[in-house]
């Protein structure tokens, strides 16, 4: 989904988390929400925590690696690695969950030509303020 409205351009963290959380709920059931660990302009790192609190799901940040996904029973879990001051910590988290990913998470790669062509035709829902009903 794409959440885009000119009124949101200069929104503060308290407004942004409500907008994003509303969009997540509107999009339907989910198991995992991935987001950056912090905004590049404010370096705040608080929006993802507010979203997770509102959604009632655990949050782990900054994640450098997703090790395993276990959906063998009703309560699925993820095992992830997160950065700490002492190094790296291995954490198991119950799904649904939110992960704040670190720049160390992945080395970007180029998709095959077919993937690029399919991406160009993909329909991504774009929602504005009126679509979400947020103030």
Regions found by a protein language model. Give the residues of each.
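N-terminal glycine-rich FAD/FM-binding segment characteristic of electron-transfer flavoproteins
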Residues: 1-135
